[in-house]
């Protein structure tokens, strides 16, 4: 079993890495949506019949 200090180290590493990974992921997703909307402006909003 890992000792308590080792688990604490992993927790601190996760807490400091997760927001960075989430920010990068959301930035890439937003960029894809923005570029898709730039090339195909009417496809994101489907009109009702």
Swiss-Prot record:
The keyword Transmembrane applies. InterPro entries: PSI_PsaJ, PSI_PsaJ_sf. SUPFAM superfamilies: Subunit IX of photosystem I reaction centre, PsaJ. It is found in: Cellular thylakoid membrane. The keyword Electron transport does not apply. Pfam families: PSI_PsaJ. One of its GO terms (cellular component) is plasma membrane-derived thylakoid membrane. It comes from the Bacteria. GO terms for biological process: photosynthesis. Belongs to the PsaJ family. NCBIfam families: PRK02733.1. This is Photosystem I reaction center subunit IX. It comes from Nostoc punctiforme (strain ATCC 29133 / PCC 73102). The lineage of its organism: Bacteria, Bacillati, Cyanobacteriota, Cyanophyceae, Nostocales.
């Amino acid at each position: 079993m890992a000792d308590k200090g080792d688990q604490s180290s992993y927790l601190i590493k996760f807490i400091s890495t997760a927001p960075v990974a989430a920010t990068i992921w959301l930035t890439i997703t937003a960029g894809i949506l923005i570029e898709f909307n730039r090339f195909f402006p009417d496809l994101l909003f489907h009109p009702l019949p």
